[in-house]
Amino acid sequence: FVKCNAMNIESLEYAQSVLHEKFGDIDVLINAAGGNQPKATVTDRLLVEDIKLVDWSDAFDLNLVGGALLPCQVFGRLMVEKGSGSIVNIASIAGHIPLSRVVAYSAAKAAVINFTQFLAREWASNGIRVNSITPGFFPAEQNRNLLFEEDGTPTPRAQQILDHTPLNRFGNANELVGAAVFLSSTMASGFVTGT
């Protein structure tokens, strides 16, 4: 592993250099940086029109800039030069359907989806496939209090989300591995781009 800050271009360039030197060509990039900005979440006391620009910016910096834009620029440059590669950006169902009140996160993930589709079209002639995985809701520390009561039962908000989830359950992070492997593999998904 090479530790880097996905929101810092110098850190990404260092990581790319170390990885390229150690392993040679970089064939696959999976961008998984992201998360919610609690100060950009609508509540009964915080309306969308009251969210500060800095909090919107924090959500976009983490999810779009660090979660797709900068890593794609840094690692994509090598892929363009060699004429092949696969990039997988982690998006969110929130980028398609605003099921909860995480407005800045949802907007930023929608931007990730659009950016993914743009790069897929832009880099297709260079032999680079760019896709996104759009997971549903996954319980994590950042949203556990919003989803579960102290006794472990779903909150009304969680139940509302589950009611709009075809499988009627929350996901597990390990369930994304197969999709990432599929989209990374030229043999399995060589004709798939822009998803």
State what each model feature region is.
Residues 43-46, 98-106, 118, 146:
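Active-site loop-to-helix junction immediately N-terminal to the catalytic Tyr of the SDR YXXXK motif
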Residues 39-48, 52-60, 161:
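Substrate-binding pocket helix/loop in short-chain dehydrogenase/reductase
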Residues 92:
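Residue(s) in the substrate-gating loop at a strand-loop-helix junction
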Residues 169-195:
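C-terminal substrate-recognition "lid" of short-chain dehydrogenase/reductases
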Residues 72, 108, 116:
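Active-site helix of classical SDR
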Residues 77, 121-125, 190:
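Alpha-helical segment proximal to the catalytic Tyr-Lys
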Residues 43-46, 125, 137-164:
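A glycine/serine/threonine-rich, flexible loop-to-helix segment
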Residues 64-65:
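Ankyrin-repeat alpha-helix packing hotspot
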